[in-house]
Amino acid sequence: MDLPAATVANLSSRFLDYQYGVLGIETHMQSPDVTEICINRPGELYLETRAGWRREAVPSLTFERARQFCTSIVNESNTGQRITDADPMVSLTFPTGQRAQFVIPPACDAGRVSITIRLPSHTARTLDDYERDGFFADIPEQATAIADHDLELLALRRARDYAQFFRKAVLYRKNIVVSGATGSGKTTFMKSLVDHIPDQERLVTIEDARELFLAQPNIVHLLYSKGGQGTGNVTAKSCMEACLRMKPDRIILA
């Protein structure tokens, strides 16, 4: 899916640094180890480093501060954009290279704001650097044989051990489509699958009605109005575009 280019905001470094301080993320914005900063709910944020996702408690991070951060950044960006209940999703690129995705209600849960900031690399790397660090060792060779994971899944299917088949399919990160008639239990079955996603992964769900209440801690629920029934100018497509800027490990489209 090709994403529209995020608009470049015309903001001064001084203004941005002040806003980072108000939000309580200024230290993380300067960290060479952090590649992503994600705010899903008041009181905490998630940082992505080479070691994976890490939760940080931020008691001063309230809903009001998070929403005001979004409003201040977007309104002062000189891009002609506004973030409002009618247009609750905005993508921006900061002059200093960071890329941001902002989502406010009704496109996410009431009382929450989703802020995702992707930080550019602080160092330039050559192909020799990648070679020395073993980066290319993880590139799989083109194989004609069926992968071991798929052989295991085929064996489970032949044995009709479907509980283990689906459990393993989730752990092996296979794409799964759940379909059925209205009232056939699709959402309930989907929840049973999601239960097996590890807690250290970041999830983003996309729904037209809030039905997926999940236990994973690093999660954002995006909401769109089917048939233009809601107040927000949000579609499944715009949710997917926003989602791809939010660094999900898994996308759950309900």
Where do the language-model regions lie?
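Short acidic, glycine/serine/threonine-rich loops at helix termini
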Residues: R50-A51, D129, A215-N218
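P-loop NTP-binding catalytic core
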Residues: R54-T71, N75-L171
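Switch/coupling sub-region of P-loop NTPases
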Residues: A155-A159, A163-S179, S192-A254
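Conserved lysine of the Walker
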Residues: K186
